[in-house]
């Protein structure tokens, strides 16, 4: 469970960066979608 909390904090930080970085938005959003789908399994 500790890992889950750390991952959620990491994702939250990356989402803030994502808003700043428009160029890599498509690539990062795809990465997050795949990442979240993997966690649900």
From Swiss-Prot:
- Annotated InterPro entries: Competence_ComC
Pfam families noted in UniProt: ComC (PF03047)
| A GO cellular component entry from the record | extracellular region
Location comes to:
Secreted
Q: Does the keyword Calcium apply?
A: no
Keyword Magnesium annotated: no
Q: Name one GO biological process term.
A: establishment of competence for transformation
Propeptide stretches in the record: 1-24
What's this protein's function?
Acts as a pheromone, induces cells to develop competence for genetic transformation.
- Record's NCBIfam families? ComC_Streptocco
* Family from the record: Belongs to the ComC family.
- The molecule here is called Competence-stimulating peptide type 1
